[in-house]
Amino acid sequence: MALEHMVWLTPKSGVGADKMEEILTSIRALTHIPGVIAISAGRNITDRAGGATHGVLVTLESDGALPGYLQHPDHQAVGDSLREHCEVLALDYER
């Protein structure tokens, strides 16, 4: 059963649009990590996201792929940048 890893991003004060696009580009580049089926990331276009300005959806082969994805060095590096520049909220569910 596939797993959806959803992430909501809210930039910290002073983080501009160029930095957010750089972050989204780095997230989209994680498709090489084993277990990843697809990655989508973009800017929110509504006022219904509780302050989040950007979102990410990562589709993984299964819930068993999540630990490897989260612990992969490339994901860790992107995660460090995310936490430096954004407030992050994540949710995972099987589909």
Give each language-model segment a name.
Residues R28-I33, D74-D80, H85-C86:
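A common structural junction motif
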Residues T59-L60, S81:
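Conserved catalytic core of Hanks-type protein kinase domains
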Residues M1-T53, E61-Q71, E94-R95:
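Short S/T/G/P-rich N-terminal loop/turn motif that feeds into the first structured element of a domain
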Residues R83-R95:
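Charge-dense polyanion-binding interfaces
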